[in-house]
Amino acid sequence: MATYVILSSFTDQGIRNVKDSPDRLIAFKAAAEKLGVAIKHAYYTVGAHDIVVVAEGAGEAITAALLKLGTLGNIRTTSMRAYSPDEMKGILKKLA
């Protein structure tokens, strides 16, 4: 399973309904799980992004989960593939 870091920012709609955000996060975790995505960590943050999520799953499953989340109109996301130190060692060995 691949690891992804997902940076989320509230839309105007999302911030108007911010009190519902914890319940929406619980619902997202359940929906993501049905798609084969495990939400490992979720943090509310202050700064450029409002929520940071660490998820594991196949790339297509992550994409499906984020597209489904986006259709609700409460947040916008940016995702990044993340590599563990061991995964990076394996990648770097291929450079030789």
What positions do the PLM features span?
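A compositional/biophysical signature of low hydrophobicity enriched in polar/charged and small residues
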Residues: 1-96
